[in-house]
């Protein structure tokens, strides 16, 4: 049930957007993706601060590309962002049957074997444009706990969370707020799996500057400490949108050997190398609009200019 406060005029535009997404979700899958590409192309032409952020990130991470090549990549990236928006509608409202039909899940046995140890499993992933739909696909194959950050818009947060909590595979999966470390520990000690994406700029206590594409980046190094505390296995998880409207592929690695390693920084670098390989494989699907290289202090360069605010 939607609380009455969300009927206030300040939410009317949000309701309009939700209505549009509800209509888009009813389209055939190829037409849904085409609607997303169209929305992305419109967004690409708007004077939004995301564009210079994405350009700066591409220049830093992919210096081997020419300016023209990076602009073409930027075009494809905004199409991917638009498709991601429409895929959120599928994540919230589509049936399990539709989701399963469009998806291929690899490595579930790796997760089952990890949980057979009895100490839980941490599923590490990164922010690509299939992040939301990928979590829904993974949950169609295996119950998971998802670490998430609620949207700033309270109405979107209410709708997203209510639908996330409704995904079932025998039982509801749980959502854990991003800063709820105790909630993560409790889930792992119950021998459950916890999915989270600690790849974005992290400037809180415990952050370290760890190279990403060879550039120091504020990084969350808590994963190895969490694994050490709980004894949980750590697995890498990739997700991608296949070309030609072929659906999605998600893949879970075998548990990482020697993890945690000699230091939390080395473990974080290992994860960053995994992300770098994925970025090079499907560059248009990476979340380029995030200010990944914001430093921990003014001692580090400002790569984004006015967009860094």
List PLM regions with ranges:
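Non-catalytic C-terminal accessory region of glycerolipid acyltransferases
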Residues: 3-8, 37-39, 43, 50, ...
């Amino acid at each position: 049930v939607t609380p009455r406060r969300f009927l206030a005029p300040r939410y009317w535009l949000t309701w309009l957007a939700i209505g549009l997404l509800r209509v888009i979700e009813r389209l055939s899958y190829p037409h849904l993706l085409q609607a997303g590409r169209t929305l992305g192309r419109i967004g690409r032409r708007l004077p939004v601060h995301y564009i210079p952020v994405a350009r700066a990130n591409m220049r830093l991470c992919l210096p081997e590309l020419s300016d023209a090549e990076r602009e073409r990549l930027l075009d494809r990236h905004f199409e991917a962002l638009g498709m991601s928006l429409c895929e959120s509608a599928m994540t919230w409202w589509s049936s399990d049957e539709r989701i399963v039909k469009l998806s291929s899940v690899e490595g579930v046995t790796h997760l089952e074997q990890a949980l057979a140890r009895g100490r839980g499993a941490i599923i590490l992933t990164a922010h690509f444009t299939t992040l939301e739909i990928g979590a829904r696909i993974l949950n169609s194959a295996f119950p998971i706990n998802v670490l998430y950050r609620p949207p700033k818009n309270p109405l979107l947060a209410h709708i997203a969370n209510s639908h996330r909590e409704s995904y079932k595979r025998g039982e509801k999966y749980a959502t854990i707020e991003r800063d709820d470390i105790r909630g993560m520990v409790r889930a792992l000690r119950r021998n459950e799996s916890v999915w989270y994406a600690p790849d974005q700029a992290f400037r809180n206590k415990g952050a370290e500057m760890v190279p990403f594409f060879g550039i120091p980046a504020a990084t969350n190094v808590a994963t190895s400490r969490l694994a050490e505390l709980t004894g949980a296995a750590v697995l890498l998880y990739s997700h991608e949108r296949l070309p030609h409207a072929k659906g999605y592929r998600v893949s879970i690695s075998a548990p990482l050997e020697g993890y945690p390693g000699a230091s939390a920084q080395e473990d974080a670098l290992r994860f960053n190398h995994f992300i770098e390989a994925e970025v090079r494989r499907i560059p248009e699907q990476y979340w380029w609009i995030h200010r990944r290289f914001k430093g921990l202090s003014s001692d580090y360069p400002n790569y984004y200019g006015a967009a860094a605010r």
